[in-house]
């Protein structure tokens, strides 16, 4: 069973880059602040350009550094996409449950993500701002159906009251770890037999100070 805990004293076994995408004002920066620092600011301003935060945690006795990247959703910042997506092994695709338009744009964001990132990147669809449930404009079932159709994980969250924020990030990070661990095992087995592993192709992941190539596999799930 996986264990999650902050640990800054051990060596880093893996560094996983995860990107936050979605329209502006859906709460991407607030989700990042809640997960990385357990903070929430009512006065949050729109993100300009790109920033990232890190959090170190433990999964199955391995020390993982999650590098979470955040960029503004406005069209004028789209120029950063190539560098932004490069090397990402996970993505949090965020919409605001009170703004139907932000959900309607999810398909476009997903297309852009899949056009720039590894085709097997692990993706979590997030319906944020459940604390504003009385203003809901996107039925949960609509998002579940989209996630199932596109082979995505799905959760609804609230950065304000922290509901499901931790589980959503940990689900993605655990899935990435599971895939990487499985591929490393296959690589070791084929290495011993003199074979080549076709699995070890795709997104670069830093492993214990060295770069090894791996790719994630999306998985369907709902919450």
Swiss-Prot record:
GO BP, one annotated term:
protein transport
Superkingdom field:
Eukaryota
One cellular component GO annotation, for this chain's record? Answer: plastid
InterPro entries per record: P-loop_NTPase, Rab_GTPases_membrane_traffic, Small_GTP-bd, Small_GTPase
Q: Which UniProt keywords apply?
A: Cell membrane, GTP-binding, Lipoprotein, Membrane, Nucleotide-binding, Prenylation, Protein transport, Transport
Family, similarity comment: Belongs to the small GTPase superfamily. Rab family.
Annotated function? Intracellular vesicle trafficking and protein transport.
Identify this protein by name: Ras-related protein RABA4c
Q: Which organism is it from?
A: Arabidopsis thaliana (Mouse-ear cress)
Q: Taxonomic lineage of this organism? A: Eukaryota, Viridiplantae, Streptophyta, Embryophyta, Tracheophyta
């Amino acid at each position: 069973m996986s264990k999650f805990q902050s640990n800054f004293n051990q060596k880093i076994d893996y560094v996983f880059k995860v990107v936050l995408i979605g329209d502006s004002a859906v709460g991407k920066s607030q989700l990042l602040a809640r997960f990385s620092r357990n903070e929430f600011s009512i006065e949050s301003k729109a993100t300009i350009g790109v920033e990232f935060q890190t959090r170190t945690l433990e999964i199955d006795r391995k020390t993982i550094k999650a590098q979470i990247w955040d960029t503004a959703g406005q069209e004028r910042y789209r120029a950063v996409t190539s560098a932004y997506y490069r090397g990402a092994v996970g993505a949090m695709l965020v919409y605001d449950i009170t703004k139907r338009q932000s959900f309607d744009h999810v398909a476009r964001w997903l297309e852009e993500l899949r056009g720039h990132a590894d085709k097997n990147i692990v993706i979590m669809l997030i319906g944020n701002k459940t604390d504003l449930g009385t203003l809901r404009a996107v039925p949960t079932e609509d998002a579940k159906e989209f996630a199932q159709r596109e082979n995505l994980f799905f959760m609804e969250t609230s950065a304000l009251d922290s509901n499901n924020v931790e589980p959503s990030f940990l689900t993605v990070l655990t899935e990435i770890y599971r895939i990487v661990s499985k591929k490393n095992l296959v690589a070791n087995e084929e290495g011993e037999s003199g074979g080549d592993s076709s699995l070890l192709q795709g997104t670069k992941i830093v492993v214990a100070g060295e770069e090894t190539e791996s790719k994630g596999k999306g998985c369907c799930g709902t919450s």
